[in-house]
């Protein structure tokens, strides 16, 4: 059980984690016991640890609701511009500890739970991750919500309340096996259902043209039931809302069709409608054109836009003239950010509402729509770009297809006027692709229908402008921007690495939590040996703690004084976990060749999920686990080298492994990783980076100095040159004896003696269709890794470099990113007002839920 803090520790933490005050603690204990009794209907004799978690969650939630209501009243009174962040993914992780930190309740809660004879850490571990995302894109949305609340922006996250989030990954005999993530099984204390705001969403049907205008009729209706989750800002009394929609069948669903009287079957068929919000599609950077997925995309968009318009009409700006609402002020009151193309149907849907329902002329509707929407691009991989078959859209959303055709016609008219003879340019820029079955290019729809398009790191935004959407940026160069991604320092430092957060606060004060650029002040301590030792001590404590966790959870013993070399992210060929694997085998071979030679001990930790249908990614996991099996059981290797595959990598596991990491692997082929955010988390937590000049690594090197990262391998231009020349994997295989040995071992069954040809698909890919050129960077990577080992032996030099990285990581706060979106795209002003809680929180009748 965690012991209570000493007075000195309390003083040190007072501002960051709140004041412990006797009254606070007494009140929290009272709230806890009240919830145990009245909410959970248990006493201490029969309560389980899960009951205690729920009692604590409800107690903390009590401290949110007044602020939540008060924030919504404040927005209702002041009518600020609102921003709506539309995303099919919100990878939130756990909520309890983050809420305690942002409300300044952590110390008081720790003390209360200790006095109640319970273990806070045990209770925190009971909470399920809200895994409503695959990886970076969904986690970015979660960080952005935290920053928007902390900056006092009137912001709403809108998405889907998936009943099953990203699958739980089990490793059986070295293979990934997926299990359903029934995260709501025990209930979710953080959400509030809002059935009073339930809205209809239409599918199928047909389009009718009448005197009065166009109507979409004979549709199937599914209801969207909103669940609200509070999003607290850091210590500013702002609590914003994430509203997730759940699909419900209407009460008369299918009953009108069953004249025969098969009432039971009609009720059972309600499941078909409700399947829309059943499960998150587990693809990262890959497009799967399934009807259910298209339904999900339209479902979230249709429900959200009705909600946005309802809220606009209820405000003083939604003024009426004789006929209906005047929407001129709409873009001054509403900004909608599309997180990738997944919510792209919002563009034709808003046009449908304006033109068909609100009876606006097309040109007016289009002008308002364009001013309202902005689009963030997240990937340049062609297989990830959404291209929906026209016949599927025609069946599911016939009116939207007509609107998309109309948008495209006007768009192409413009192209033809500007480039009269350039037919190929029209083909390239059309929203409709003709070759191989008609498809709608959703990225093109977004670019045409938005006033701003941004990439997520400088290098990525350049590639977007000069390669992927070159024609569009020639047409409207001012539309294209860069907004380098960021991470929230609340979760990714205060919560996951309290030792480091406190150490920094001792040196520079605690204001850095809301202004991470202040970390540059740490540069003045690079010569302070005592401070460097303290930083190293925090890292060692984190490594020890993680080692104990691994031993308990995975029954693996590792050497906590070895270098922790960590590669955690989705398993994908472009992220090149294979390159890491080849290096592991190379190190193994070197130890075996000369066992007496000194070797810097390493624990290589690789983790991440493979999409269930991605054969190559699953083979990569099997290779890693097979190599681990051989390496970890070779007595000649002993504790010099260990390989761990980290099962079921997720937000709550990232919070454990990142603070314990020495070396962060960011080794995608240059030009393939849009930004990455794991790289930033490692940097902030005192790991050094080995990486290519890709994504945000480029800007990390810019901030810290390239000499303070381990940069290797081809740059974007080198990759292009190699493509032009023709990449011949065999040349590298023949020229590099160590690489040849490694590949031969994999090929001849050294790591799969019972199935010698198990990895033939990997070998075949590496030689004949490796788009990501693993062999081309192998030599540079291995050499760079030798430099890493050398530096690790000089702990003072290593820790100096660590401090330089931490001091340079301030740019990568999502607060900075959101300030840039607010200024350059949304035209909104962050507010540092601490909302007053004085107004009676119970009198907000007309503000409630608005």
Curated annotation (Swiss-Prot):
UniProt: AMP binding residues: 43-45, 76, 310
PROSITE patterns in the cross-refs: PHOSPHORYLASE (PS00102)
PTM characteristics: Acetylation, which is up-regulated by glucose and insulin and down-regulated by glucagon, inhibits the glycogen phosphorylase activity by promoting PPP1R3B-mediated recruitment of phosphatase PP1 and Ser-15 dephosphorylation. Phosphorylation at Ser-15 converts inactive phosphorylase b into active phosphorylase a. Dephosphorylation of Ser-15 by phosphatase PP1 inactivates the enzyme.
Primary location: cytoplasm
Modification type N6-(pyridoxal phosphate)lysine: residues: 681
InterPro entries recorded: Glycg_phsphrylas, Glyco_trans_35, Pyridoxal_P_attach_site
Modified residues (Phosphoserine): 15, 524, 561, 639
Ways its activity is controlled: Allosterically regulated through the non-covalent binding of metabolites, being activated by AMP and inhibited by ATP, ADP, and glucose-6-phosphate. The activity is also controlled by post-translational modifications including phosphorylation and acetylation.
N6-acetyllysine PTM positions: 470, 796
Cellular component, GO annotation: cytoplasm; cytosol
Family: Belongs to the glycogen phosphorylase family.
Protein name, entry field: Glycogen phosphorylase, liver form
Species this protein is from: Rattus norvegicus
Gene: Pygl
